[in-house]
């Protein structure tokens, strides 16, 4: 089963629309930034926070970019993901 098929099935199970290609891309960027700026666990939890906040993936990505510009997305001295 492809990721697209799995996501479509899970979306149906949850009673929501299947994410668009753009939404998936925005979530992957967000997850990647979270995992590389912190620990891997931050990736799925960051995506959960987007949903919890009721934001679109695009809006969350925009806010993340603003946060990064202010220098807050990576703690000083952090070099990347930790396991």
Model-flagged regions — what are they?
Residues 17-55:
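Amphipathic, hydrophobic secondary-structure cores in small proteins
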């Amino acid at each position: 089963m492809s990721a697209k098929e799995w996501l479509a099935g899970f979306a149906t199970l949850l009673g929501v629309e299947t994410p668009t290609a753009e939404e998936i891309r925005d979530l992957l960027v967000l997850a990647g930034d979270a995992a590389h700026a912190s620990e891997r666990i931050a990736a799925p939890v960051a995506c959960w926070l987007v949903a919890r906040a009721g934001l679109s993936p695009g809006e969350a990505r925009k806010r993340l970019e603003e946060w990064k510009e202010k220098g807050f997305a990576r703690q000083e001295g952090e070099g990347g993901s930790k396991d």
